[in-house]
A protein has these predicted regions:
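Glycine-rich phosphate-binding loops of nucleotide-dependent enzymes
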Residues: 1-185
Length: 185
């Protein structure tokens, strides 16, 4: 809400309504031994506290809502998540964070390594979230995606801000590459 926050743990981020989906879904996202259902509700349960389990009816409603909204296939919440395609695993992870009702959603390479159909569905959901007022921080090396989806582009190199660009007719993949290339070594 326009104020700075000192976040030092995932639980503090959840409490501040900030969600982060890592680019490394296999090592930092999914828990391979759990079902789709268990992976999807994980963040909501963590936010609520492990001593207060979510009622089964609430779990089922959340799982149904996000599996349907994100078109997770196959639509079997009890299937091990490791049996899903990479794109569907990514959709479950996005659903996990959406279920926490974030005000800020940080997506790190959300479409890397997934098929074009899943990529399109995820991007449509991201656009809908932005339209609903969720602040999206979209980290991507796919510059065409960045240009198409962004109101504002901050170009970083070696942890330094090179430029803060507004999305207008002059913002293109080439203009971003030029910004990076023109930076003195």
């Amino acid at each position: 809400k326009g104020s700075q926050a000192q976040i030092s743990s995932p639980s503090q981020a959840l409490a501040a309504r900030i969600a982060y989906a890592s680019e490394n879904r296999r090592d930092e996202g999914i828990i391979r031994d759990l079902s789709v259902r268990e992976n999807l509700i994980l963040a909501v349960q963590a936010k609520r506290g492990w001593a207060r389990p979510l009622p089964a009816q609430e779990k089922n409603a959340l799982v149904e809502k996000y599996m349907t909204a994100l078109n997770v296939r196959p639509a079997d919440p009890d299937r091990p998540i490791s049996n899903l395609s990479g794109g569907n695993q990514q959709k479950v992870l996005l659903g996990r964070w959406l279920a926490t009702q974030p005000e800020v959603l940080i997506l790190d390479e959300p479409t890397r390594g997934i098929d074009i159909g899943a990529k399109t569905e995820i991007m449509e959901e991201v656009i809908a979230l932005a339209d609903e007022g969720v602040a999206i921080v979209f980290i991507s090396s796919e510059l065409d995606e960045v240009v198409r989806l962004s109101d504002r582009v901050v170009v970083l190199k070696d942890r330094r801000k090179l430029a803060d660009l507004t999305a207008d007719a002059s913002l293109t993949s080439d203009s971003i590459i030029s910004t990076i290339a023109e930076e003195p070594a």
